[in-house]
Amino acid sequence: KRGKNKYFALNMLKSFTVSFFVLIIPLLLNLLMVHIVFAGGTYIPADVEMLKSEPNLFQSYSNPMFYNILYILVFSFIGGIVGSGATALAMAFPNRFILYPLAFILWYISTAIKPSIIGALTPFTVYPLSHYTFTIIFVVAINIVAVLFSFFKVTKYDQV
């Protein structure tokens, strides 16, 4: 028999792992197929001189594979964190009528702040990933707070 702490930690680990791999595997397969079909992705859909005026955009188009993989990893990591936050809330609030709005609010806050988390998940924009550092940290922080709140609620007050 496992204790409450171990049960909660294993569920968070499983949730993060499943969410992470559900996102990363199809994205990497898609990247591989696009790389094969389009012969390495050497086509640049814009004027090179225009790209030089936007250094961040030029840099991402100069190293497309690196930036694609970087954004896939960031997207999958954030998806894993959000999945863990939602799982933690599901453990703390078994009533679905409370759970669905709470999970939605967590994601809505992430998309409503400026700059939005959506921009951090979109490669090949004029903004570098560092432009979204605060947003990424904020999203991770609110989901960690959800996990910690749920941890204390589940382990201290609920029967598991």
Residue positions per predicted region:
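Short, aromatic-rich membrane-interface segments at the entry and exit
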Residues: F97-Y100, I118-A120, F134
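Junction motif at the cytosolic side of a transmembrane helix
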Residues: A88-A92, A141-V160
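Interfacial "coupling" helices/loops that link adjacent transmembrane helices in transporter permeases
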Residues: K1-M12
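Residue-level recognition of pore/gate-forming positions within transmembrane alpha-helices
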Residues: S15, F104-Y108, N143
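Secretory targeting signals
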Residues: M12-M91, L129-V140
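Central hydrophobic cores of alpha-helical transmembrane segments
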Residues: R96-S110
